[in-house]
Regions:
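Eukaryotic scaffold repeat domains enriched in small/polar residues
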Residues: 16-415
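Sec-dependent bacterial lipoprotein signal peptides
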Residues: 1-14
């Protein structure tokens, strides 16, 4: 039998003075369908207002000691003691800093030998102090530490596949390494996840959720060339690993996110207002695709699926170290002048489209806390690290200097 209840949560007013208006919590509909628990937020939030992220400290300088100069930050990891570890793609090494942003030590260097990195792109840390680095250039996970322990190498067949996905680990010290399914034909390969136990032994291989789903594409053929390009704003699969194990996933066109549980599924949903795609932006996306594909197939014109009139509600998923879910949602774009425009370059546009970042934040049980609007210099690449009310992320200033910044959630209604 289907069970349904409506719950209206409220924020305590114990600290409020007379006449203070108390914000109500979210209106939530819960449902149980088979082994799936659905938590559907209709309106409201626990916080009662939007939040932002305020910087607490930063690591990185334009000039100064080499330890504080970053070339290109590829990955960030934060351990249980709140030490932060930074993987530099340009230098192919890791620098570790304590909770006060003071440099502690470095790990690795460019190369192919033990303890060396060739094309490292993602990093994670274990509770015992070990640092793990996914290095598809060397076809292995490189393991450093704890302390001065000799490095270890956990080999796997990367298929020379470089991915921007994080290196996932869980509370049982299992490691999930993304790789292509080499049993499938080239150009149509799904991602798989190779599961290592804490000692580096492969124990399982998992398929990405919704593996049969295919994003809409335009396909052009001519002169012996084949070019495939995704249709802008078309739905796609988004999935991440939860620190308790299991996937958190969804199709971006639906505000419906499934978290795998040992005995079922927790489905998190929220009412949303669709965000339109500006016709001007759709035209620009189509023209850019025609120019790019035209480099390989001269004269090609768009003949694929239309660009959607609305953006998918979800553009990214992130799970915090404590299990909170951060959902990056679509926002309306605006035209801005392209400061890097090259008038003589036909592939350089005079304007570009920008959309502000915005996250919906849920507790691990699906309770909607509220929305977070990060500052303009906040970047989602590499993926930030979320830990309770703290967030570690890369910021770039007007001179394009990278810094790793620790932020804290603050309600925008607070003085």
């Amino acid at each position: 039998m289907r069970k349904l209840r409506v719950a209206a949560l409220s924020i305590s007013a114990a600290a409020c003075g007379p006449g203070t208006e108390v914000a109500r919590g979210p209106e939530v509909v819960t449902d149980t369908i088979g082994d799936t628990i659905v938590v559907h937020t209709v309106s409201g939030s626990v916080w009662g207002s939007d939040a932002t992220l305020t910087p607490e400290l930063s690591i990185g300088e334009m000039d100064g000691p080499d330890e504080y100069l970053f070339g290109s930050v590829a990955s960030i990891a934060v351990d249980d003691d709140r030490n932060v570890h930074v993987l530099d793609r340009q230098g192919q090494y890791i620098r570790s800093f304590n909770v006060d942003a003071q440099y502690v030590r470095s790990w690795g260097r460019r190369g192919e030998g033990p303890g060396e990195l060739a094309n490292a792109a993602a990093m994670a840390v274990f509770a015992d102090g070990r640092i793990l680095v996914r290095d598809h250039g060397n076809n292995r996970v490189q393991v450093f530490g704890p302390g001065d322990a000799p490095p270890e190498e956990w080999g796997y067949n990367s298929g020379n596949y470089g991915s921007s996905e994080p290196l996932w680990t869980d509370r049982e010290s299992r490691t999930y390494v993304v790789a292509p399914d080499l049993s499938q034909p080239f150009g149509a390969r799904d991602n798989i996840y190779i599961v290592f136990d804490p000692d580096g032994v492969v124990r399982d291989t998992l398929r990405q959720p919704h593996a049969g789903f295919r994003q809409a594409v335009v396909r052009a053929e001519g002169g012996g060339a084949t070019v495939i390009r995704s249709v802008p704003f078309s739905p796609r699969v988004i999935s991440v690993m939860h620190p308790d194990g299991g996937f958190v996933s969804g199709i971006s066109s639906d505000y419906s996110i499934d978290r795998d549980l040992p005995d079922g599924v927790l489905r998190i949903e929220r009412v949303y207002v669709p965000v339109r795609v500006s016709p001007r932006q759709a035209d620009q996306e189509r023209e850019e695709a025609e120019r790019m594909i035209g480099m390989s197939i001269p004269g090609w014109q768009w003949d694929g699926p239309p660009i959607p009139e609305t953006k998918p509600p979800i553009t990214g998923l992130y799970v915090g170290l404590g299990g909170r879910l951060w959902v990056r949602v679509s926002t309306e774009g605006r035209e801005v002048e392209n400061p890097d425009h090259e008038p003589g370059n036909p592939f350089s546009s005079a304007v570009r489209w920008e959309a502000p970042l915005r996250f919906d934040v849920f507790e691990a049980d699906g309770t909607y806390l509220g929305a977070v609007n990060p500052p303009e210099d906040f970047s989602v690449y590499p993926p930030p690290v979320f830990n309770g009310d703290e967030v570690w992320a890369v910021s770039r200033d007007e001179l394009d200097i990278q810094r790793v910044v620790r932020y804290r959630i603050a309600l925008e209604s607070q003085p």
